[in-house]
Amino acid sequence: MKFDVIIIGGGLAGLVCGIRLAEQGKYCAIVSAGQNALHFSSGSLDLLAKLPNGQAVSQPLSALETLAELAPEHPYSKMGQTGQVGELAQQAESLLSRCGLSLVGSAAKNHLRLTPLGNCRPTWLSPADIPVAPLEGPLPWQKVAVIGIEGFLDFQPQMVASALQEQGVEVTSDYLHLPALDRLRDNPSEFRAVNIARVLDLPENLQPLADELARLSSTAEMILLPACIGLDESAPLEALRAAVGKPIQLLPTLPPSLLGMRLHQALRHRFQQLGGIVMPGDAVLRAELVGNRITGLYSRNHGDIPLRAAQMVLASGSFFSNGLVATFEHVYEPILDLDILSLPNRADWSNSNMFAPQPYLQFGVNTDNRLRALRGGVALDNLHVIGAVLGGYDPLQQGCGAGVSLTSALFVAEQIVSAMEVTL
């Protein structure tokens, strides 16, 4: 089986890279081992929220020069300074829009999004259906009703209300009861956001839901709900807003996250619409190397039949997705045993304070400045690395996980197109 490009991993980075390559006429395949981390995502995308020294960042693009001094191994530092990463961030915003995603925000300045705990945290892009606020000044909401769903344990309205009250917002909290959900409620393991959304999205449940929300939010100017409506699109939420006559915004729930799933579905649909091939439930087990070039990939489902392409992209994710594997002695990349940025002493891998930066989060594959994978200190000619499997950055403490995935994906797509034009 032969393609122009094979991408190992179907998460945010892999899909975005595949979309950009397919938009430029490349025949791409994505080998995806299973459910990716987007299903656990809030739907918001971070670019850069903190520098490695802990300094908060309000304007991500203006902080890249300082970041390069503090963290030369950071993917942003390798991809270039403000101009390069800023251009890639703008390209990412345009690409996501072409996928039909309605997002708010700009790479020029972070904004605040409301979390499921009622706190605010800075981010780059957020779904239009979640509550956001400017980085400075008081919150824009005066009277809010936070309404949960009776029996739904993955969202606690009182916790959100308490946090908002501490920030000066007048809040009420309550639970709605809808008879249509009673069958699901009898089985707690089935009472999850995705299954609830399938019920609430039905047209016959719109008016009963609207009546219940109107009853519980009589004095409120805005309603906050758990993200349990609009499984495939925002039309059910828009209809509910019209029926209630008030702004209604969604807060992410515990996984599986409906907002993250919608992001994944939109990206995958766009990739396949452009002619891309997705091989779900498969995993690349080994690679065939001739010199510094990969000539074939062997996967679990295809056995001895190699997958061949002129260019390969590793987007296999971090430990969560088995893109990196840790033993008691060391961390390694399981397909090609690529060079890893890590620490030799296991005692240094983690910090006993769970809220402190964890060194292992910066572990990942080492690359050259073109994001080509290093193996034995030598760059492989046709293997680029993108997303969470990259080393040199802390996606949680630095608030840059999605940004690295998006910008590295687009950066590598450009590298691949240029390389393939040279070889034609």
Curated annotation (Swiss-Prot):
Keyword annotations: Flavoprotein, FMN, Oxidoreductase
Keyword Glycoprotein: no
UniProt keyword Flavoprotein present: yes
UniProt-recorded Gene Ontology molecular function terms: glycerol-3-phosphate dehydrogenase (quinone) activity
Signal peptide range: none
Documented EC number(s): 1.1.5.3
UniProt-listed InterPro entries: FAD-dep_OxRdtase_2_FAD-bd (IPR003953), FAD/NAD-bd_sf (IPR036188), G3P_DH_GlpB_su (IPR009158)
Enzyme class: oxidoreductase
Protein's name according to its UniProt entry: Anaerobic glycerol-3-phosphate dehydrogenase subunit B
Reaction equation(s) it catalyzes: a quinone + sn-glycerol 3-phosphate = dihydroxyacetone phosphate + a quinol
Gene name in the database record: glpB
Gene Ontology terms describing biological process: glycerol catabolic process
Species: Yersinia enterocolitica serotype O:8 / biotype 1B (strain NCTC 13174 / 8081)
Cofactor: FMN
Quaternary structure note: Composed of a catalytic GlpA/B dimer and of membrane bound GlpC.
Gene3D superfamilies listed in its UniProt record: FAD/NAD(P)-binding domain (3.50.50.60)
Domain of life (superkingdom): Bacteria
Cited function: Conversion of glycerol 3-phosphate to dihydroxyacetone. Uses fumarate or nitrate as electron acceptor.
